[in-house]
Amino acid sequence: MTDCFDSKEFLKTVTSQPGVYRMYDKAGTVIYVGKAKDLKKRLTSYFRAHVASRKTETLVKNIAQIDVTVTHTETEALLLEHNYIKLYQPRYNVLLRDDKSYPLIFLSADKHPRLAIHRGAKHEKGEYFGPFPNSYAVRETLALLQKLFPVRQCENSVYRNRSRPCLQYQIGRCSGPCVPGLVSEEEYQRQVDYVRLFLSGKDQQVLTQLISRMEEASRLLHFEDAARIRDQIQAVRRVTEQQFVSGDSEDLDVIGVAFDAGLACVHVLFIRQGKVLGSRSYFPKVPAGTELSEVVQTFVGQFYLQGSQVRTLPGEILLDFTLAEKDLLASSLSELAGRKIQIQSRPRGDRARYLKLARTNASTALVTRLSQQSTIHQRMKELAKILNLDEINRMECFDISHTMGEQTVASCVVFDANGPVRSEYRRYNISGITPGDDYAAMSQVLKRRYGKALDDKKIPDVIFIDGGKGQLSQAFDVFASLNVPWDKQKPLLVGVAKGSDRKAGLETLFLAAEGEGFSLPPDSPALHLIQHIRDDSHHHAITGHRQRRSKVKNTSALELIEGVGPKRRQILLKYMGGLQPLLNASVEEIAKVPSISQALAEKIYNALKH
């Protein structure tokens, strides 16, 4: 207990109802969020003569203020607790650092339903399938579905404005519901039903229906239809034979945990309709002295409750540990999902094998992460020594990319004590400068980045500038002109110049805008760290520049082609199904567009390719 916090007086005001409490330090920062069935009883436990753990003892010493929020039920308290944890990211809570929503496959409720990748809240009417471990898995599945079932994947804006079928129809990837007469309502709906069954894991039902239709077509002597359905059957069989299918068709999330050297790894295995869709490893931030059961308990709550609007809840969750609040979590998730959600910790049979697999993956991922951290920590320590710093907790690096001065993009990448912090990587579109003036570009991005109030934790110890003394001089000038509330003297500015032939290992470092720089040995761990952050910055800048250049080029290229006016541009985009299919089209395919001659098709093709 601190001198400035009177726990006895505070506890006199606390109710015995359920609710959530927030603990603050002297600076007014939330350091811990908790919930309780009985607030008075729970908060009193913090101020006994003997507390439960060293972690709690350290927490109590830092308390300067406590706020409480009373709720109607314990379930409400649980939901509010995890929302507050997400909002405040308190130092003494276990924190799930990756809160990105999972991608899903969306089947719309339109007259002619479309398939699409989806992230975020489920506002649009339709059906959602997933979750998938990453967007690549969704795109791969959508591409596969296009080959198996010709259901449209175009945007409604394109679909509504078509009068002729697009390229996807011509290559057999879409049945063309946009143009009357190409496919019957019954046949299109049948393909949509196949998609629905396939995504629900009911492959055998799809095959049974297709086989029945093929036999019927043969009986009626419709051999072309029978051959087409036969090809579809073979394609579906090839896909289903490649997938591991359990005898159990339920939806499961399997959560395995590993812990070592103060670092925890939680590995989630996603199983839908008996198929392993994929998995993902998480490394939650764990305060010292935290029990592993608390890590699992908090992870499950944050993982499902914080992302409640965007995650697809399975019917059952298998865990590595027995949770103290298992029933409360299960009832809260069931209430959220509108159906029963079970939480199991002692599975048998296939479920036990799944849990063992998740546990093995967690251990493997943890070993890899510890190895990477050990290397990063060694390099950080070596770099701090070379730069005469006590320690380095945060570094940022800047690079500029452009082509002949056009579409200039600056990048900023961030490393902390554990390596890259990719969620904080940023790109800046540079404008209002003389084309090709890298000094002005660097000056602009530094002013935009640092010419404002910064949280103490966001002030870097080292700022690397990709370039020689000229770029570093610009950085010094910018920092000299800053009028900010934080200590602008804290960051050490370092220029990184490549050798004459730009080979790795020949970099020269500059700590001042004048005088000679110095180089590090090629095998120096500190140099390897500098190369890592510099290369990340360069890649981030050039990727952003290419995206910006491509966007400008693609939108303006059609306008620059002689003989292609607004009307022809509209016809081209409508016929091809958008700009991307047009970019991928051959001369022959472009020539099929109404009012486009062979000569003009060649001109369009060459203009878009070069």
Curated annotation (Swiss-Prot):
A GO cellular-component term linked to this record: excinuclease repair complex
PANTHER family assigned to the protein according to its UniProt record, in alphabetical order: UVRABC SYSTEM PROTEIN C, UVRC/OXIDOREDUCTASE
Protein name: UvrABC system protein C
Encoding gene per record: uvrC
Keyword DNA repair: yes
MF annotations from Gene Ontology: DNA binding; excinuclease ABC activity
Residues annotated as domain GIY-YIG: 16-94
HAMAP family: UvrC (MF_00203)
Annotated Gene3D superfamilies: 5' to 3' exonuclease, C-terminal subdomain, GIY-YIG endonuclease, UVR domain, UvrC, RNAse H endonuclease domain
